[in-house]
Swiss-Prot record:
Subcellular localization: Cell membrane; Cytoplasm; Lipid droplet
Record keywords, A-Z: Cell membrane, Cytoplasm, Lipid droplet, Membrane, Phosphoprotein, Repeat
Protein name: Perilipin-4
Keyword check for Isomerase: no
Family according to the record: Belongs to the perilipin family.
Induction: Up-regulated during adipocyte differentiation.
Signal peptide: none
Source species: Homo sapiens (Human)
Gene3D superfamilies: Flagellar protein FliS
Sequence repeat residue intervals: 109-141, 142-174, 175-207, 208-240, 241-273, 274-306, 307-339, 340-372, 373-405, 406-438, 439-471, 472-504, 505-537, 538-570, 571-603, 604-636, 637-669, 670-702, 703-735, 736-768, 769-801, 802-834, 835-867, 868-900, 901-933, 934-966, 967-999
Compositional bias of kind Low complexity: 44-72
Region (Disordered): 1-22, 37-86, 1060-1093, 1240-1260
Amino acid sequence: MSAPDEGRRDPPKPKGKTLGSFFGSLPGFSSARNLVANAHSSARARPAADPTGAPAAEAAQPQAQVAAHPEQTAPWTEKELQPSEKMVSGAKDLVCSKMSRAKDAVSSGVASVVDVAKGVVQGGLDTTRSALTGTKEVVSSGVTGAMDMAKGAVQGGLDTSKAVLTGTKDTVSTGLTGAVNVAKGTVQAGVDTTKTVLTGTKDTVTTGVMGAVNLAKGTVQTGVETSKAVLTGTKDAVSTGLTGAVNVARGSIQTGVDTSKTVLTGTKDTVCSGVTGAMNVAKGTIQTGVDTSKTVLTGTKDTVCSGVTGAMNVAKGTIQTGVDTSKTVLTGTKDTVCSGVTGAMNVAKGTIQTGVDTTKTVLTGTKNTVCSGVTGAVNLAKEAIQGGLDTTKSMVMGTKDTMSTGLTGAANVAKGAMQTGLNTTQNIATGTKDTVCSGVTGAMNLARGTIQTGVDTTKIVLTGTKDTVCSGVTGAANVAKGAVQGGLDTTKSVLTGTKDAVSTGLTGAVNVAKGTVQTGVDTTKTVLTGTKDTVCSGVTSAVNVAKGAVQGGLDTTKSVVIGTKDTMSTGLTGAANVAKGAVQTGVDTAKTVLTGTKDTVTTGLVGAVNVAKGTVQTGMDTTKTVLTGTKDTIYSGVTSAVNVAKGAVQTGLKTTQNIATGTKNTFGSGVTSAVNVAKGAAQTGVDTAKTVLTGTKDTVTTGLMGAVNVAKGTVQTSVDTTKTVLTGTKDTVCSGVTGAANVAKGAIQGGLDTTKSVLTGTKDAVSTGLTGAVKLAKGTVQTGMDTTKTVLTGTKDAVCSGVTGAANVAKGAVQMGVDTAKTVLTGTKDTVCSGVTGAANVAKGAVQTGLKTTQNIATGTKNTLGSGVTGAAKVAKGAVQGGLDTTKSVLTGTKDAVSTGLTGAVNLAKGTVQTGVDTSKTVLTGTKDTVCSGVTGAVNVAKGTVQTGVDTAKTVLSGAKDAVTTGVTGAVNVAKGTVQTGVDASKAVLMGTKDTVFSGVTGAMSMAKGAVQGGLDTTKTVLTGTKDAVSAGLMGSGNVATGATHTGLSTFQNWLPSTPATSWGGLTSSRTTDNGGEQTALSPQEAPFSGISTPPDVLSVGPEPAWEAAATTKGLATDVATFTQGAAPGREDTGLLATTHGPEEAPRLAMLQNELEGLGDIFHPMNAEEQAQLAASQPGPKVLSAEQGSYFVRLGDLGPSFRQRAFEHAVSHLQHGQFQARDTLAQLQDCFRLIEKAQQAPEGQPRLDQGSGASAEDAAVQEERDAGVLSRVCGLLRQLHTAYSGLVSSLQGLPAELQQPVGRARHSLCELYGIVASAGSVEELPAERLVQSREGVHQAWQGLEQLLEGLQHNPPLSWLVGPFALPAGGQ
């Protein structure tokens, strides 16, 4: 090759630390430039000698210049063919912008993605279904939820709504809050009025009754007729009533007290305006038939109670059976304010809370929680749970900073039937901190029993929330190996471990083990444990029950608080430790127990009860609330979380169910909940609403809050009104009912008539609707709920105006026959929902068949905005969501999401889930800072039937980030089952969106091995991995294997491989000579890029390099080497767009390979035949792209025979964007080198002469060139941003830390763009800032290159590789 060519190929690098050296030092820049210069050096030389070409002198001139002035001339000679280079970049930009429609996409329609496996999915949806996965900052005006279900039928025939929210932080609920831990027994069956238990609160203020009772191996509190309050270990407590503490061993104690008895032990500087006492009882029968009031306060410090507060530890006996009015238990709360009832209950090996007529509240370990409703969380395992709830049940788990205006809760249920036949609402929340509840708050852990069957009114459980405010109902329930919450008549709330919680309702936490607990409570029961600085205006208590029956048939109120410090009580305060005996049987009016609370303020009842191996609180008529560990949570609705395993879950909810898990900073105006269900049927026939919220922090609830952990028993069957349990709350304010109950190995809360809420571990969550999360395993759960159920889990800073929850369901039937709405929200952070939010994980069962109104599922969304419906569903090996009548939304893992509708996410596995839901179901999981104005949800379903016959709308949203949706958004991953057949209204699925704006309906659904979305009547939308996307209408894409998909979908298909590079169709090559005499390859295409017309600008203006354009015309089935093949001869023979190549190019290609050796291996994309073979192999769940026609698949889901080629295919697309970025950076380097020269040139000389050899030019021309260079730099920076966006679309599914370099690179780019764009001329450029900013771009690109190189050597199995073309007819 000639010396001039040599000089062109290898221009000398500038000496010294000049600006140009920043880009020059980058690896691969020179090769990116030289690749083009090289390929066309002979193309430049040959026309010079061509007889029909330019004169020989003209041809010789540039070569002479190169020889004479290599340093000067190299830049422009290199860039002489920039038009053709731009040609390639432009074509690639077009492609990249198509490829990355998951990000920066604008749609006027509805977008959705579906992965389906081994089943029929969504045949006959009448309106729209939206699913959104992994969204951040999503706004939904519809329904949002996420549900994990396993091995059972889930949510068939729910009549109204169920919401589940888990892990919310900073949640606001207007409902009830509570958390209950129940183990191996039946708990809270038939309590007639209210029972509140509060344990270990610190700095608690209670306006009701406070006390805490530890019971072991006996029967406790059966048939108390008036009121009993027990508070233990209080310090600096203020009581306006009775104060006392009793230590009893091996005998019968206080049987038949007619008026009032108060026992207080070891209190220091205590003031009680009510009744305060603490009782330690062992091996005997205790407090049977107290007619008026009994108060026990132990170890509380600076506690103020205006209601009833108490905490009870019960083991191996029957406890508190037949309480007619109310019982409140609050444990270990700190700085909690409750205006209602607060308590937390741990129950094991027994039946728990069966037939509670009114309300029961349990709050545990909440911190700075404010509840205006009811909050609780329930963990259920290996039994039937919550079958036949008549009104509402809400569950929330682990939410942080969540705001809910509806219901919020999260429930963990295992191996049992759960929440069958709840009539009104149940809320469960666990682990909230700083929770504010205006309703009822509690958390309950249930195991191996039947749980919450037939709740008529409300049940709320909230656990571990922090700074939670609830205006609705909030709770989280962990239930294992038992039936839970069957037939509660009114409300039950459980809240556990809240800190700084404020409750205006009932607050309490109950730990129950190996016995029957709280069966038939007539009015309200509240349990709160370990709250600190809690203020309760209602009832707060926490109960630990073990190996006995507890609190069966309380007629009026009972409150128990243990270990409160600085407690003030205006009502009854006390704490009782009971072992090996029967305790407090037949309390007619109110019993309050408060233990170890510090600086707690309660306006209702506060207490916590630990019950083991007995029957607990059977037949409560009024309310029970359980709240656990909430922190700074605010709810305006209902929040709860339920973990259910091995049972049937939430079948027959009539109104709404919301499930949300792990949301953070969530705002919801609808319903939010999350349900984890495993190996059982869950939530069948719930009549009204159930809310469960778990692990919320800084949650505000205006509804119901609670969390319930239930194991190996039946829990809370036929509670008539509400039960609230709050445990370990700190600085909690509850205006409703708050409590937390841990229940194991028993039946729990069967037959609640009104509401149950469970909230667990929420932080700073605000819910205006229903919020909760439910984990169900190996049992039947929540059958026949009539109104609403809400479950919220792990949300942080979530605001819900509707219902929010998340449900994990395994090995059972879940949520069959929901009539109204079910919402599931999981793991949301800073989420705002105006609708319904929830998340459910369901496995091995049929899921959500026959929902009549709406179900929303959202998973893993972050900072998502949705004005429509958003959700994501993962479904495997089962039929899912058949016959939903209205809408279903699933949202998972959203962050900073705002929902005005319903939000939830559902993971279903090996069971039937949510069959026959009449109204709406919403599931939201793992959302963070999500805003939804519509419906948002995500559903993971495995081995079961899912969502068949949805009548109205189903929305699924997963993992969306910064998405805004005005329509319906959701994402569903379905495997090996039938999914969403006959949805009447709408279902939307959206996955992995970030910063997405939707004005229509958006969703993403991953389905595998089944028929998907056949016969959608209106719209189905699936959107995956979109970031900063705006949709005004409907956008849909279906991805299906082994079945029919998207039948009758009236949307549009648009995908990049099929789009021709029409922009470049009319390119022509022309040669002109400008006044300087240099040759320039000009083409008409400059104008679209810069609008500059002077020939020297060609070096920085023009279409993409021809090798890329050629590749685009070939349909993107080429790699870099092929690009070069197509490009080099094109420049010789037929112009910019030629794609032919001949054997004479081999040496040049070999040389180019040498140039590219520094780039690593060059990979080839899969050709059409290979992609067809891949599609025929039915790879694991497909994730549809933002536009129809292609899909992505997790690398780990591909078979071994395809994995390597699919990896190479994905890397080829990454390299495609990488080379585009390198080429653009190389051009930027040249532009900055010119700017450098201009800034250094002496006056009177042409600055931007570009080596043209021209003499001085006048000022006007100089200014024009200045502007041309600046606009050229801006254009290149925009191109680079587009290239980065293309890289983003190829990096889906990677861990967050691996995606950070892309964000840093784009951020540095925007900074540099701002500096250049704000300068009017070259002189105005700030040299120092320019150097720093370019250095930042340089470093960010190096980090990006390292990431891409590491990805080639060590690709994670979670990487979504693609895009692959869908086979014809595979939509």
